[in-house]
Amino acid sequence: MCIRDRFAIIQSAIVTSIAVIGKGWGPGATEAGVFIGNRSMELFVDIAMTTIAAGMVGLALSALARSQEQIMPLLVVAIMSQLVFSGGMIPVTDRIVLDQLAWLTPARWGFATSASTIDLTRLVPSPLSPNDSHWHHTSGAWWFDMAMLVVICVGYTGFVRWKIRLAAAN
């Protein structure tokens, strides 16, 4: 585990603590997480894994940019696409292009793990929220979402290693 991942985990712990202690769970919240049992700890794991995967996207963008001037436009596009493809603001489920592109973003799977942990489909039933199978409060949905975050981390890590090897060869 690198220093970047440690900072991501610490930041996730701070954000989760502020949200849980400051805001509380509120009425109607699920009593337990899907897999871990402790909903606060599971929410922390969701956010920490999402933060680590998002950090890998940042590393991939850094490897892609050839100069410092190129990185800012890439970051703007990456951040805006994360907002769109998470599925929280704009439903991506069953939308032909959005649904497929969302599979490449950590925000999609991070939001899905958190939605699965807090049972978002029960808290905000359709038609206000999409009937996304990845948001269901089941261990299968939660594990699939987590596995997708791991796949994204591995994929972007492989891309970064490939770009670094190309740069070293030149």
Task: Identify the role of each PLM range.
Residues 4-170:
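Membrane-spanning alpha-helical segments of multipass transporters and channels
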